[in-house]
Regions:
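Non-ligating segments of multi-cofactor redox enzymes
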Residues: 1-116
Length: 116
């Protein structure tokens, strides 16, 4: 089974994955194959209160419209979201292989669309 692994420690919130996916699937306004979710802002950890440093976290979440770009991956290409990720924090492959990349040092999310 294949999936997409996202190291959201490094996601910059650029929305490139959303745009590439939306264009490929031809989805109307308000529908997504991958949706960027923002959490924050909150004060930066370890800073004195009121110093003005804030942190955001961005997490791309695959939706039920995602088919892992089956037509592309069958030809050996990457899913559009992975190919267009500007931060290079998205990976496509076998779930077992992707799970081995998760080192416990950063924040990871492993998505397996269609898995039950």
């Amino acid at each position: 089974m294949n999936g997409i692994l996202i190291n959201y420690e490094y996601c910059t919130g650029c929305h490139s994955c959303e745009v590439a996916c939306k264009k490929r699937l031809g989805l109307p306004e308000g529908e997504f194959g991958i949706k960027l979710t923002e959490t924050g802002p909150w004060e930066y950890a370890g800073e004195p209160k009121g110093e003005g440093r804030w942190e955001w976290t961005w997490l791309p979440v695959l939706t039920k419209a995602c088919d892992l770009c089956a037509d592309r991956t069958e030809k050996g290409k990457m899913p559009m979201c992975v190919q267009h990720c500007q931060a290079w924090c998205m990976y496509y492959g076998e779930v077992e292989e992707l799970a081995r990349k998760m080192d416990g040092k950063t924040r990871w999310a492993l998505f397996t669309p269609g898995a039950k």
